[in-house]
């Protein structure tokens, strides 16, 4: 098993399913361990990226939407920018977070 595959399996946590835009079917999605941070003017969006296990199509699960940067703790914001795997795993195992993003598990 490749190191990359082992890391992906490690971060999968709760098995998450979603209709894949690439495959067109309900597929298992895996926590990539990566965050996407987008600043638009004086607002910030933060997503946790999941990938389709079959075709690698991405699905962004929203953590913060159109939030003022000061509302996000500075240490947490730095962890998002650094793609901290422990933080990604915490979110991936948080059922409330998954429910907010309409994930099936």
Can you name each region flagged by the protein language model?
Residues 1-17, 33-41, 61-105:
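Short, intrinsically disordered terminal segments enriched in charged and Pro/Gly residues
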Residues 18-23, 52-55:
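Short cysteine-rich clusters marking metal-coordination/redox-active sites
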Residues 24-27, 59:
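Cys/His-rich microdomains that often coordinate metals
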Residues 26, 30-35, 47:
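Generic short beta-strand segments
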Residues 43-60:
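Cysteine-rich micro-motifs
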